[in-house]
């Protein structure tokens, strides 16, 4: 996949003009009180519910087009909105309103010997671009999190959800206007032409950061072609390592949960590593448990399968010779998302957690727990698999930067 496609100058102008409007809106958003933002979020939730019939009508147009194109049922389900899901996205906005506001939080500060008073505090990023695939709920999630963190957002969703996203954004913008706020805090970019992505991710000086949400192809293309900072999210080749000191009952329960709970999400297990010391018993037992649950086990995996994010009822199985071999395997094939060890050996667990390079490392727990809500952060914009600027579940604090404030009393620096 490539997002680096030529486009007519008018599309470039359209995207850049939207970014300029977002920049203006972001300057006001950065100074809003917490109560004003919370009131706007609650108003947006009310408006989404009031406009549910319009949103569902738009969604039905998208679904009709998708069905005609032979879209698989799993993808249709991700695209679909119904009254219950509309209730869910509205509840999500109210939840964000209840979360602590990160803007203005003082992270550290002190008074220097010369009397200067320093403090470092959180400030919004500014203009955030979100590029995402066919889940219209992301439209509302992204709006809620960016508004609460004082950012303006440019949304570039999938053409498969064009009518759904347009209806949702119309409701969100109407709620902002009703609250006396700038509707350009949230804007939907054209999705009919892939080049709109190119113009968004190359709008250096207009857009502060772009966050791609979707499959590996989308994320790789955005990161490759972007000229503005990006935060990679989501690609998950997650492993469960069953150590020689593992309780196999526990290992089986954790493995089945990690693989089968929701196989199409980024925190699902895609590989299981079994210690050679227990392989004779553990391999047939865990293979049978997986197969009984409907999982296809790739027991002699190819290089491609070892690196695969299946997002399906498939899993690669490999035998490793001890904890260091497991660590080496994970660091070679993992995507830096979530890795898990099942063991009763504290030293082995500590070695694994210290040496595995991932955003989250689980000990005797399912990879499925890597989630902003499960971590107690509330909503999230995605799971960052990079190290700068954020790593792991991205909640409100991860949508901020910092500013140093220095107070003096006529201070000047000596020559």
UniProtKB/Swiss-Prot annotation:
Pfam families: Aldedh (PF00171). GO terms for molecular function: glutamate-5-semialdehyde dehydrogenase activity; NADP binding. GO terms for biological process: L-proline biosynthetic process. The keyword Lipoprotein does not apply. Pathway: Amino-acid biosynthesis; L-proline biosynthesis; L-glutamate 5-semialdehyde from L-glutamate: step 2/2. The keyword Cytoplasm applies. InterPro entries: Ald_DH/histidinol_DH, Ald_DH_C, Ald_DH_N, Aldehyde_DH_dom, Glu-5-SA_DH, GPR_dom. Keywords: Amino-acid biosynthesis, Cytoplasm, NADP, Oxidoreductase, Proline biosynthesis. Its main location: cytoplasm. It is found in: Cytoplasm. Catalyzes the NADPH-dependent reduction of L-glutamate 5-phosphate into L-glutamate 5-semialdehyde and phosphate. The product spontaneously undergoes cyclization to form 1-pyrroline-5-carboxylate. Belongs to the gamma-glutamyl phosphate reductase family. This is Gamma-glutamyl phosphate reductase. It comes from Mycobacterium sp. (strain KMS). The gene is proA.
């Amino acid at each position: 996949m490539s997002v680096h496609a030529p486009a007519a100058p008018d599309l470039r102008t359209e995207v850049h003009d939207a970014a300029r409007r977002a920049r203006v809106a972001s300057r006001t958003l950065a100074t809003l009180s917490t109560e004003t933002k919370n009131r706007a979020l609650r108003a947006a939730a009310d408006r989404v519910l009031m406009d549910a019939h319009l949103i569902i009508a738009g969604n039905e147009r998208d679904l009709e087009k998708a069905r005609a194109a032979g879209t698989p049922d799993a993808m249709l389900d991700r695209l679909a909105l119904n009254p219950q899901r509309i209730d869910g996205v509205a509840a999500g906005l109210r939840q964000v309103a209840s979360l602590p506001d990160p803007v203005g939080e003082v992270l550290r500060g002190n008074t220097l010997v010369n009397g200067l008073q320093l403090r470092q505090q959180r400030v919004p990023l500014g203009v955030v671009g979100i590029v995402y695939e066919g889940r219209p709920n992301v439209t509302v999630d992204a709006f809620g999190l960016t508004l609460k963190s004082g950012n303006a957002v440019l949304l570039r969703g999938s053409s498969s959800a064009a009518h759904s996203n347009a209806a949702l954004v119309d409701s969100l913008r109407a709620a902002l206007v009703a609250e006396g706020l700038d509707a350009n805090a949230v804007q939907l970019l054209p999705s009919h032409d892939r080049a709109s992505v190119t113009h968004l991710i190359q709008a250096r000086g207009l857009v502060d950061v772009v966050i791609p949400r979707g499959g590996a192809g989308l994320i790789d293309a955005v990161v490759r072609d972007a000229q503005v900072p990006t935060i990679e999210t989501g690609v998950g080749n997650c492993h469960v390592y069953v150590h020689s000191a593992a309780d196999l009952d526990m290992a089986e329960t954790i493995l089945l949960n990690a693989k089968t709970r929701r196989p199409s999400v980024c925190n699902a297990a895609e590989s299981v590593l079994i210690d050679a010391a227990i392989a004779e018993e553990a391999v047939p037992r865990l293979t049978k448990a997986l197969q009984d649950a409907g999982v296809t086990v790739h027991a002699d995996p190819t290089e491609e399968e070892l690196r695969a994010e299946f997002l399906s009822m498939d899993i690669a199985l490999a035998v490793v010779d001890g904890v260091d071999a497991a660590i080496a395997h994970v660091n070679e094939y993992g995507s830096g998302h979530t890795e898990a060890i099942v063991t009763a050996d504290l030293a082995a667990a500590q070695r694994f957690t210290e040496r595995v390079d991932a955003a989250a490392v689980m000990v005797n727990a399912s990879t499925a727990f890597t989630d902003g809500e499960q971590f107690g952060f509330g909503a999230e914009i995605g799971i960052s698999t990079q190290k700068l600027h954020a790593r792991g579940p991205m909640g409100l604090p991860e949508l901020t930067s910092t500013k140093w404030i220095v107070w003096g009393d006529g201070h000047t620096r000596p020559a």
